[in-house]
């Protein structure tokens, strides 16, 4: 159809770019003055953060010298009109009056400061500047709370940020110049502590109030979104951008100029011609649509390179408009990123592609609303679209269809109005999204531009004269498991988060100095887990690979699930110096578990930025000195160094000593000597409170009753790159019955009643290391600490000094003395740290009992090992409340069990002693009874071993409460064995050594049965076992055999000489009575004979079965006197008993028979032969005993 001259074009108008607005019936002129002032202040903070008169004058020039009551009122109105809420008159008047008073006093303070700068040694100028500082400081402490009056925090927030910034500035002055003014060191430190506290307080208030203000707005319609976005943009510019620079006021962290960057994005109003007073929001998207699809998700910082615009048209009237577009951007150091098509890829005109060779700092747009008349009776069609935009760069302009009147500079004005906008602009265009909604009868399209602050540079260039702050969102690649999340409000942009250990991000840096120069870096981060951050340099362009340059710990700063606040963010110390590999270079950052933490990764790590500084010699020496001073002072409970802090470990002191030793003699020799004396004093205090003897491992087993005792395979080694002093190495063992061990007893005389004590130390690495503390019960921990092999970087060998000693001053992996893993009652470690602690409670002390505390380290596995040192046993704290009641209860239970044990021991000892005495003919224990056999000795030994607590079950070399009586009886048992061996002329008659000393014909076996009992098995009738034995002719002998016959036939044990004089014992599995030559024992009457045998020796040993059975006099529920919980079987047994003890002998199974005969040899040699006629013959033992004369 033909163009209708009645079609109307309504110009962009009203609230999108107001000249004036109506609030509560009162007309108020606005001009974004608060935004102008804030942008100028941010530009000043970015480029001129050096303290002194120049900085103060800048604050006057940009804020406090030009803003009067009307301007402060405009600050308030700026927010009031957005949230449609007026501050109460009393609060408004008080705030403006206080701001005016602060401005006046600040001007007086600046005058006094400048006078002092010109004449710093004049007492009058020093006194005046101190007075003016204290007055202004007091006013700020008083008045700042008036800018956060409950109910009006949001409209007051922009003036709160200005006052907070002023307060931090003058506090920094007092910390830097205070001592030169005449303030004491204590005053200066108190001001510094207030400065740090207020940095967090002010930043958190700004972020929290910003979020609360946005959350309180309605969120339904398009117009709601317009208000929401304007408030978000204005509070970002006037509050959050300023708060992002608050941490830079920490002059001890930033002794030189930091270079800050703001990477956040702000959005100008959508280019849609809409008048909410005249038109319906039904033709526009809802709040949720605008927020979810027109606002970008958190992402890496990108740079706009190209914008391709597709033109669409509406057939009625042939109206052309911006129908869709595509954005091509790039990451710093990365390739191009092409966005999806926004809107529609229309082709009513050829696409217009704009490649910008510089930042777009301004747009002049033409959003229109055309009321198109359609054929009757159709209503007019509302067509909203963008019919033209001009994009301006500092050197050129790019126009799409035509230039408009909607100027982006009205919403984002320049930061410097003294120069043309192409030089003084504040923001650059970074992206564009698209709005579209259609219906009857309307079509609404529009564009939303997003902008980044000019301070975010287009390269990550390292300025050697400044501390370079690089937000990690300026990387070019995030790895799986890493995500970009919305920043908490005070970081100046988005941040990175990682939930699991692994690669974090890769970024490219440009070096503005020789490639050989060395640098240091640190991180600003928050974390709900302890971890390590690895920095690799020289990675490939893909971010893969590289060489480890920095490896430093990140200490946990928050709990899992805790909200991010300024207080949860911390800084690492500057790393050791490193060098870049190329220019530009690729930095790879990854998060790894702490040494010994395994794969545990619960929690999250958030990183805001990395900070890089040139490591010149002076700065390096000053930084090292500051770090050493901080570490030394942190050792003591007070500035007079009277006492050590309880949590300062001996290992910690050694590492602080290394820091001091590595200080430069050239730059700080006097300070180094002073700090060295303090560290030596700390070491002496550590030695004094340590109750262990010989904690430095001068020797093991040097003295029988004191110091360390240990197995012979333990080695003592001198200091290395991990330990400064001696440490011990415990190897593994092939037999758990013979563990590697190290122990020491803490004497009762050193202990205080009702006190908790702590064992702690440092483990370089360990596997299956068992640690015990024993008093009333056993505190036990198995510690596995994977070692690093060295503290030096993976790319370098451990440096050594000129004499072969470890060079502890060479660059190495960062040491964090705060990392610890304490294993206490009711707690379990998430992982095993190199630092270990184990505590034990002491109740009443008794020097007569001398219970003391046993400290034991043990390894009982073949793969086990440990390297440990800096061991301490020290008083932790007195027991109170529940802990006191618990130890009293444990002590009572221990004493009750001790009494039960004593009663039991009296009974068991009496029975065991009677059994042992019955083996001998007299009390001199030098002759055995004639009829004493091996079973009787075993049975007596079994009864002796019923005496409990002879040795500690945790380590059987340590004597227990019944050690004396046990060793008394056990010594007599060994005497019995020796006398018995001397009397028995047959060698290896119990087959414990296999077939040693026996001659074998045919196939025979020695088998272990019933818990290591060795028996001879003759399975074939043609097999024979024999032994030649020397005897005394004319003397009498007893041949005694214990054996068992399976199946038919007979088993025979024969004794004979060369020609004659033969006798034998026969064994069969028979039913009928058989008579054996020279032996009256038969199969049918064997049981009766055994009963007679038992009756004969009632007062002595009662045979295998009875002797190895349970003793009903022993309480079945008796628990260990040492470890109440770990042992519940009624016995605290150690499975590793003596090889000659009862542990290797168990009761004979039913069916075994013991037979004997008397034999009188006529020559000096006899032969013992064992065989059978059929079936299987099993022999337990063969004895040939010399009769007593």
UniProtKB/Swiss-Prot annotation:
GO terms for molecular function: signaling receptor binding; toxin activity. The keyword Acetylation does not apply. CDD domains: delta_endotoxin_C. Belongs to the delta endotoxin family. Promotes colloidosmotic lysis by binding to the midgut epithelial cells of many lepidopteran larvae including Spodoptera species. Toxic segment of the protein is located in the N-terminus. This is Pesticidal crystal protein Cry1Ca. The gene is cry1Ca.
